[in-house]
C-alpha cells in the first residue's frame, strides 16, 4: 500500500511502472510499422533487474502466449502495448510542436525512464529538466552513460519527489519562470491523490509564463469490481507463465472519484485546454483493437489534455 512519504528506486513500487512503460516502447520500436522509435528502451529495461515479467514483455510472442490462457487478458495486453505507443507518439508530437513554436525550456514531471532528452532532435539551446525520485534518475543517466549514450539537449536532473516542495529545486537547477515552458505530465496523475494533483497544477501555473503550454495524461476511473477481476486474471496468467508478479500496479494507484477533470480545472485557472480521448487518438492512428473490455465506458480510458497559458 502507498503512504504519503513512500519512496522507491527503479526496482520497487512506482519505479517498476517506468520499466513496464519502457518495455512497451521497446516492443513498439521492434515493430515494422512502429509509431515511435526508442533505441534506448530495451537497454533500460534489461539492466534494471526489476524481474522477468517486465523483460518478458519484450517478447513479440507474448500476446499469443497470454491468449492461449485468457483471450480477454491477451486483448488487454495488446491494448496496453498499443496505448503506450500512441501515448508516446502523441506527446512526442506535442514536444515537437513546442520546438517549432520557439520554446526551448521543457520540464518532464516524474520522468521515469523517459528517453526524450536523448532520442528527440532538439535545437541548440534547448534545456530539458527531468523531475523524479533520485534513484530513478540516477539509474537512467548512469546506465545510458555507461553505454556511451549522451543527451541531445542540455538535460538537467531535479532529484525530488513531486509531493515535496519541488519548485525551489527546479529553480536551483536553472529553470527560468520568465521563459515560455512546455510541461509534460505523462503517466503521473494516477499515482497522486486528488489534492496533490490540484496542488501540482497550481504550482505549475505559478511557474508558467504567458505562452507556456502543458500536456497531461489523465487518470481513468475503474470500479472496485473491475480492478479485482483484472488483478485475478493477470495473477492467473502470470502464474501460468511462471512469472512472479512482484508489484501489483493497482495497489500503487490512487482511485479518487473526486479527482478534478483536468481540462476543466485548467480552463478555470488561466489556461486554454482541450482534451482528446485515448480511444479516439488510437483510432486516429489505426491502433484501436477489437475485444478491449469496457470499450463503451469513456471514463475507463485516459484523455490526453493539452493547454496554453493565457
Curated annotation (Swiss-Prot):
Pfam families in alphabetical order: LCM
Keyword Transmembrane helix: no
Binding site for S-adenosyl-L-methionine: 132, 161-162
EC class: transferase
E.C. numbers: 2.1.1.-
Keyword field: Methyltransferase, S-adenosyl-L-methionine, Transferase
An example Gene Ontology molecular-function term: methyltransferase activity
Keyword Magnesium: no
One GO BP: methylation
Family, as annotated: Belongs to the UPF0677 family.
Function: Exhibits S-adenosyl-L-methionine-dependent methyltransferase activity.
Protein name stated in the entry: Putative S-adenosyl-L-methionine-dependent methyltransferase ML2640
Organism (species): Mycobacterium leprae (strain TN)
